[in-house]
A protein has these predicted regions:
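Bacterial Sec-dependent N-terminal signal peptides
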Residues: 1-24
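Short beta-strand edge segments in extracellular beta-sheet folds
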Residues: 739-743
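Glycoside hydrolase catalytic-domain context in secreted enzymes
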Residues: 16-709, 717-731, 738
Length: 743
């Protein structure tokens, strides 16, 4: 009987899957469900970790208690478990194998925060597509990415996993990842389902401490934290993951307003929602459920379809249904969403790992794309004419704990990266250094936190023999990511002392940072003649470093997050709101505070007495080896209506002596509205590549609907009024024009 059922289901799917019409998928799902028992249905709402006793896993599969398994990356094991599910489980429903694939599978890409610095939607999409090719080759069909939590506090370790502080940039890049993972069709063997996470507000953890309380008002959710998720819904993302945090006192995994009223009813999302690891059971420590039975009821009814690893659904739903506390209709709807995804992925038609004659893993094209993305993700923060290194350089000293740290340069969540395939900076320099140029490599610190007593005499002695000094500093991969928050963002260990020792030699010093977050680097920038921020650049980070330092590639990255002067400024971000006492920007000199003067003598502005209110480096900032000039800003239609777009033209000229790429950025702002609004917001950007001396007119389009916000009555829409338009190469300064929105 079971064999007949499996054959019937596969035949049924084969007949309808290619067209991928929603109605046909729904018909398939209903046919499958008509043959499922209650136990089968409950099993389809349960996800487990495969890194456990495989005998136990096999037994659970045979009982129909497993819908999805994560963290198995052996194709033969995946096929073996899948065969048990298809041939021996009661319903014959295939398993969906999943993995946290945040920035590359085997070939590790720059961390997402670094990718965001590229402002290159197309390249990020291509890199994500390569990731899907690698992962699906061994049977992974569901990736827990992209992560799009807006983060404005670099103390939070998971800032590394997202696209920074700006909703517009995060929206565009998250959509690029979704398109890369899912391709043109989920049923394609080369595609895998993306998962928009973490819904929502997780990046607003108080104090930057992971899993901490978040306070995000409804208006801020709509204006700041919702946009990337809504953009992914519109792009067809297959799944969502709820977050660990609460929103206005209700944990996200059990928040019906978020998971049903907003996500499904308001935005029209039809895919499935999975909890984060154990977050269904997490309602107990949150204090809103007395046990897992109550947590299961709350979360399922809220709209969380699949329970990741808390076993709350598996162990309690049958009893809840029997007692009448959970409706069978609610269970059925959750099962439909899970099965719909499996059908769309073609799992019934082709449940096993695809066979390939030639592996794409670590292939030439994949590595080249990863290298290019690492180049474009790197941000040149300072250059006193030392870079790129020229033919006059005959001896190079390379040092620092990140110069040969293959594991650490991959960054957080590089679960399947292999350091044996990772090219470090010193390896790339040694491999590519022109003949006649001598390399001196000094392993001055074993790792970034190394506090070994060292006066660096040997290092300074070696440095005096070199024409240029290159120091690779930063943080280990374990210093960022989940549960890895920091209160002190300065360089750890003896790294700053090492840089001081190098600078004392008087030789030109190039400092290259590899880190998972913005660090506090004001003093290090002063010590250095050039500063390149590479984030954690991934597998090809070493080659990218060589290419950038020697001018084989020209830096074009722009900061996707504001760099603070010190931790006391945090949170600091460019799109802050108007206040009643706006800082002038000249405040912050403690030495100028007079003695025994009236309280009001210093004025009344939103500032500090001991540090300037401005950041060390603004959002959107990044230098190049060439220079650019923007001119002739014009707005095509100075007055627009709600259905229009604001079309902007600006001339961009490469005024330097080499080819380069500039990111032209358009910001809007308004001085009056029904609610307080940000002083400026990024609304468009365009990467433009220009040869030396070349000038080009760049067109930017801002749909008026993108100017919508959460109004005073909490409705979503635009308001008529006058807008300021600023077009520049960062969030500070630029050319200014105006337009008016009429209703």
């Amino acid at each position: 009987m079971k064999k007949y059922l499996i054959t019937f289901l596969l035949a049924f799917c084969l007949a309808f899957i290619p067209s991928a019409a929603h109605q046909e998928v729904d018909n398939i799902v209903e046919e499958i469900m008509s043959r499922m028992s209650l136990d089968d249905k409950i099993g389809q709402l349960h996800q487990i970790d495969g890194r456990t006793d495989l005998t136990k896993v096999c037994d659970m599969i045979r009982k129909g208690q497993v819908s999805s398994i994560m963290n198995i990356v052996d194709a033969s094991v995946i096929d073996s478990l899948q065969r048990i599910a298809v041939e021996e489980s009661p319903s014959g429903i295939p398993i969906l194998f999943a993995r946290d694939i945040v920035h590359g599978f085997k070939t590790i890409l720059p961390i997402p925060l670094g990718q965001a610095a590229s402002f290159d939607d197309a390249l990020i999409c291509s890199a994500a597509r390569n990731t899907a090719l690698e992962a699906t080759e061994i049977g992974i069909k569901w990736a827990f990415a992209p992560m799009m939590d807006i983060a404005r506090d670099p103390r939070w370790g998971r800032i590394a996993e997202g696209f920074g502080e700006d909703p517009y940039l995060a929206s565009r890049l998250a959509v690029s990842v979704v398109k890369g993972y899912q391709g043109d069709s989920l049923s394609d063997e080369l595609s895998m389902a993306a998962c928009a996470k973490h819904f929502v507000g997780y990046g607003a953890a108080e104090g930057g401490r992971d899993y901490n309380t978040t306070y995000v008002p409804v208006r801020s959710l709509y204006d700041t934290y919702f946009p990337p998720f809504k953009a992914c819904v519109e792009a067809g993302v297959a799944s969502f993951m709820s977050s660990f945090n609460d929103n206005d006192g209700v944990p996200a995994t059990g928040n019906r307003w978020l998971l049903t009223e907003v996500l499904r009813d308001e935005w029209g999302f039809t895919g499935m929602v999975v909890s984060d690891w154990g977050s269904v059971g997490g309602l107990i420590p949150h204090g809103v459920a007395k046990d897992k039975k109550e947590a299961a009821k709350i979360c399922l009814e809220a709209g969380c379809d699949m329970d990741m690893m808390s076993y709350s659904y598996l162990n309690n739903l049958k009893e809840l249904i029997a007692e009448g506390d959970v409706s069978m209709d609610v269970v059925d709807e959750a099962v439909r969403r899970v099965l719909r995804l499996k059908v769309r992925l073609g799992l019934f038609e082709k449940p096993y790992t695809r066979k390939t004659s030639e592996s794409v893993i670590y292939s030439e094209n994949v590595l080249e794309t990863a290298c290019r993305l690492a180049e474009e993700s790197s941000v040149l923060l300072k250059n006193d004419g030392i870079l790129p290194l020229g033919e006059d350089i005959k001896t190079v000293l390379v040092t620092g704990p990140m110069a040969d740290a293959a594991y650490d340069q991959m960054g957080t969540w590089a679960l399947d990266g292999d350091k044996a395939h990772t090219l470090t900076p010193v390896e790339a320099i040694r491999k590519n250094l022109p003949s006649g140029v001598k390399l001196i490599y000094v392993n001055s610190l074993d790792y970034p936190r190394d506090k070994s007593p060292d006066d660096f005499k040997a290092l300074k002695k070696a440095a005096r023999k070199a024409d240029v000094l290159i120091a690779f500093v930063g943080e280990e991969q374990m210093m960022s990511g989940e549960a890895h928050s920091l209160s002190d963002l300065h360089l750890q260990g003896q790294q700053s002392e090492m840089l001081e020792a190098l600078a004392s030699t008087g030789k030109p010093l190039v400092t290259v940072f590899m880190a998972g977050r913005p660090l506090v680097i004001a003093s290090e920038m002063e010590l250095s003649d050039a500063v390149l921020y590479m984030w954690h650049p991934g597998t090809m980070g070493g080659q990218a470093a060589y290419n950038l330092l020697w001018g084989k590639a020209n830096p074009s990255g722009k900061l996707p997050v504001t760099f603070p002067r010190n931790e006391g400024q945090i949170p600091i971000y460019y799109n802050h709101k108007h206040t009643s006492h706006i800082a002038k920007g000249t405040e912050g000199n403690l030495d100028n505070v007079p003695r025994e003067m009236p309280q009001s003598v210093m004025g009344h502005t939103s500032s500090y007495l001991d540090v300037a209110p401005t950041p060390l480096l603004p959002f959107g900032f990044g230098l190049s080896y060439t220079t650019f000039e923007l001119s002739h800003l014009r707005v095509e239609t100075p007055e627009v209506r709600a259905s229009d777009s604001v079309v902007v033209y600006v001339d961009v000229k490469n005024t330097g002596d080499r080819q380069g790429c500039e990111v032209v950025q358009a910001y809007t702002g308004r001085k009056s509205a029904s609610t307080t609004r940000p002083m400026k917001e990024l609304k468009a950007y365009e990467r433009v590549s220009l040869e030396a001396g070349e000038c080009r007119t760049v067109r930017l389009e801002i749909p008026v609907e993108s100017l919508a916000f959460c109004r005073k009555d909490l409705s979503w829409g635009t308001e008529p009024g006058n807008y300021v338009l600023t077009v520049g190469t960062s969030s500070e300064g630029g050319l200014v024009s105006y337009f008016k929105l009429n209703h």
